[in-house]
Amino acid sequence: MPEQFAVPRSVEWEETSVKILNQQKLPEKTEYLHLTTKEDIYDAIQTLKVRGAPAIGITAAFGLALCAQSIDTSDVSAFLRELRKIKDELNQARPTAVNLSWALNRLLKSAEGAKSVNEAKTNLVHEAIQIQVEDEETCRQIGQNALHLFKSGDSIMTICNAGSIATSRYGTALSPFYLAKTKDLDLHIYACETRPVLQGARLTAWELMQGGIDVTLITDSMAAHTMKEKNISAVIVGADRIARNGDTANKIGTFGLAILAKAFQIPFFIAAPLSTFDVSISCGDDIPIEERDPDEVRRINGTQIAPQEVPVFNPAFDITPHDLISGIITEKGIITDRFEEEIEALFSAEALT
């Protein structure tokens, strides 16, 4: 990790708690929370105190491992029954990001082969830590695979926050910018503010400035004008779930950016780990879209900006069809054509390793 990488970790394991960076308080305040109960973990995920698909998965994994330590039985079958109940409850915290269920299922599997409750509890902690370790290397590799897509002097647009604080380290869509800095590649990022929760303004702008990365903030409605006037060379975003055909769920506004990128003949890239793919679903129509509190739209930082009685449609995500995507950057390489065939081949190869 380069010395100038000053972005704090979003999630850390402690023996008696899960320590998270409270992303709801950024950028005004750097606050850490110590989560000690199932309810704490659920609330942190649901209320966006921790967010970003990989970070959600890591937090849930740590949370399940932590809650397991309090299951008071020496019977393995009884332990696993209680563990499954906790897993199912945590899995309801947010419906769109597939990393949540992926991490919880992986942890459950690590416990199911144990011969004793103590062994199961130990396995859960080790597996959760391993998920975090793997995610950091995965994100670094995603950035490495993306680097050749950009050249020094390029201006690149992003939305939401697919950065270091959305993962264990580096990020997905923002990973190449951290790596570019270590290689003296001059890249400039235009970050869309990302209404209504302002992850681009509050989080991406903050973390890139923490990391010494050249960033300019724009409102979402400025994207088309910025593409034209600032010679944007590419758009890169993260993902919360990717279907078998390459259709991608990501933060609301992503679909619009993809349409604009096509209009300006700008490449549009998704950056995501294999854990974000859901090969059990055929297309984006099968991805559940979370709808959030209407007051997220009616208010900004607690200040009323719209009539309290006005009806609000507030989907947290949208679906970008695969035919608008130039490439999906993963830790195993870049998928650029025949998405369904390449995704199927990639997961078939993974199953053999």
UniProtKB/Swiss-Prot annotation:
<dbReference type="GO" id="GO:0019509">
    <property type="term" value="P:L-methionine salvage from methylthioadenosine"/>
</dbReference>
<comment type="function">
    <text>Catalyzes the interconversion of methylthioribose-1-phosphate (MTR-1-P) into methylthioribulose-1-phosphate (MTRu-1-P).</text>
</comment>
<comment type="pathway">
    <text>Amino-acid biosynthesis; L-methionine biosynthesis via salvage pathway; L-methionine from S-methyl-5-thio-alpha-D-ribose 1-phosphate: step 1/6.</text>
</comment>
<dbReference type="Pfam" id="PF01008">
    <property type="entry name" value="IF-2B"/>
</dbReference>
<feature type="binding site">
    <location>
        <begin position="51"/>
        <end position="53"/>
    </location>
    <ligand>
        <name>substrate</name>
    </ligand>
</feature>
<comment type="similarity">
    <text>Belongs to the eIF-2B alpha/beta/delta subunits family. MtnA subfamily.</text>
</comment>
<keyword id="KW-0486">Methionine biosynthesis</keyword>
<keyword id="KW-0028">Amino-acid biosynthesis</keyword>
<dbReference type="InterPro" id="IPR027363">
    <property type="entry name" value="M1Pi_N"/>
</dbReference>
<dbReference type="GO" id="GO:0046523">
    <property type="term" value="F:S-methyl-5-thioribose-1-phosphate isomerase activity"/>
</dbReference>
<feature type="active site" description="Proton donor">
    <location>
        <position position="240"/>
    </location>
</feature>
<dbReference type="InterPro" id="IPR011559">
    <property type="entry name" value="Initiation_fac_2B_a/b/d"/>
</dbReference>
<feature type="binding site">
    <location>
        <begin position="250"/>
        <end position="251"/>
    </location>
    <ligand>
        <name>substrate</name>
    </ligand>
</feature>
<dbReference type="InterPro" id="IPR042529">
    <property type="entry name" value="IF_2B-like_C"/>
</dbReference>
<feature type="binding site">
    <location>
        <position position="94"/>
    </location>
    <ligand>
        <name>substrate</name>
    </ligand>
</feature>
<dbReference type="InterPro" id="IPR037171">
    <property type="entry name" value="NagB/RpiA_transferase-like"/>
</dbReference>
<feature type="site" description="Transition state stabilizer">
    <location>
        <position position="160"/>
    </location>
</feature>
<dbReference type="InterPro" id="IPR005251">
    <property type="entry name" value="IF-M1Pi"/>
</dbReference>
<protein>
    <recommendedName>
        <fullName>Methylthioribose-1-phosphate isomerase</fullName>
        <ecNumber>5.3.1.23</ecNumber>
    </recommendedName>
</protein>
<dbReference type="InterPro" id="IPR000649">
    <property type="entry name" value="IF-2B-related"/>
</dbReference>
<feature type="binding site">
    <location>
        <position position="199"/>
    </location>
    <ligand>
        <name>substrate</name>
    </ligand>
</feature>
<keyword id="KW-0413">Isomerase</keyword>
<comment type="subunit">
    <text>Homodimer.</text>
</comment>
